[in-house]
Amino acid sequence: MCLLKQLSAAKMQSLSSLILATTAGVALGGNVVSNSQSAFVHLFEWSWGDVAQECEQWLGPKGFKAVQVSPPTEHIQGAAWWTRYQPVTYNLISRSGNETEFASMVQRCKEAGVDIYVDAVFNHIAAGSGTAIGGSKYGGRATPIYRAAGTGAGSPQDMHHSDGDVGKNCGVSDFRDKHNVQYCDLVGLPDLCTSCDYVKKTVVAFINHLADLGVAGIRIDAAKHQDAEELGSLLSAANTSLFCFQEVISGVGEAITPEMYTNNGAVTEFNYARQLAPNFLDEGKLQFFDGFGEKWGFLASDKAVVFLDNHDTQRGEAKLTYKNGGLYQLANIFMLAHPYGYPKVMSSYAFAGTDDGPPSSPVHSDGGVACSAGPGQDAPWICEHRWTAIANMAAWRRSAGTSPVGSFQKMAADVIVFCRGQTACVALNRLSSPWSGNAKLSLPGGSYCNVIESDDTSSCPQVQVNLDGSVNLQIPAMSAVALHTGKQANTTLILT
């Protein structure tokens, strides 16, 4: 089973001592994630070389925990983004690079303090027939990934299929029917029998190979379309040091729910964005975020991976994406400031059509990056994780640690202030005009960088917190002020 349990630093230290005292020769992973003090980034469709440079030059220094990368396995040819989600073999050759480049990226990121999470696709295989990006031939249910022992031919028995006809199968058509969702073909993609011995061994070998290369975690694509117990059995046979999170899209009245998968690992909480977005899009609703989290009907915080949008939803149901500019940035600030779940920041490329693939130009070149500098600014790669306000919230979140939200203050219908313990406070203004006023914070007295604008302690805009915690806040329109003890500008105090 994949690592999931969230532990405090004290408990981790105690557990480590116990393990050292009572076990020998047992490989235990160091990838336990404390959701309330970490964040990761999805570098969608980045090359392995670009990911490695980004870990070294940006993600590591900024304090991000990990990177989710696009599926590294051999896939069908084509420019559309979704070609990556039609695997032909589990060879590590893709639009992003080859296995040597992949392995180098994993190690370089690890040295920079950044883990790699792989988007793993093993619910299905590629549809149709042809030659894959690495030269492998494929043909639907006769794909080279799965070969009958000793025959050299594809084995249709490795797929779910219709009774009496191994060459055909039903299609997913009724989300109220569990069997239909999990044993029929999703949008025509041959559905793997992940409980079948040969398939299970093949997938486990693939996952273990990733772990051997230093990969720290996997996102399980289309987990909803695999029986939770069968998936759990497969994962329990794989490297147990990996952090796993499962894509389970929830829907009203559907037979399959995210809660069915929490025994296997973390789960994507799609309702997070669905409920958060309207409260940012509509005026006057920021005040209602007091009590936000599990009370809103979400998964338990330590089981949830949260996001505003992902590579699928930004082309579909998502109400907030980079195209919403400053409002999207403000919602990201809130997500990174709030302790619920393990937040994932989407890093997009510019697209007009829903099928558009990534830019042909690299992100890193000639010492610069082809990224937008902030909301509303054009560039081939959007790189939301590089927007100053979002990037600097990773360190803010680390400063907040495991502390819950305290002293939630409603300054106006669309202006809120809250702190996390005595180390981090944030004020958000969704108004179309600046807001100024006095608030009471739990921070020690001193001068702090407003990291929304800069985290350079020698030149950042400063906010003075008095010894009693009182502060005068000047918040620009559709923006925020974020202060934490990791970025104090100086030690000058004002006595009150």
Specify the residue positions occupied by each region the protein language model found:
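Cleavable N-terminal signal peptides of Sec/SRP-targeted secreted and luminal proteins
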Residues: 5-6, 11-29
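Active-site-proximal helices and loops of the catalytic beta/alpha 8
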Residues: 19, 25-40, 54-60, 64, ...
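Aromatic- and acidic-residue-enriched carbohydrate-binding clefts of CAZyme catalytic domains
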Residues: 35-38, 75-107, 144-193
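Active-site mouth loops of central-metabolism enzymes
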Residues: 40-49, 189-200
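Short glycine-centered, acidic/aromatic-flanked micro-motifs in structured strand/loop junctions
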Residues: 43-45, 92, 222
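Intrinsically disordered, low-complexity acidic segments that are enriched in bulky aromatics
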Residues: 126-131, 135-146, 247-249
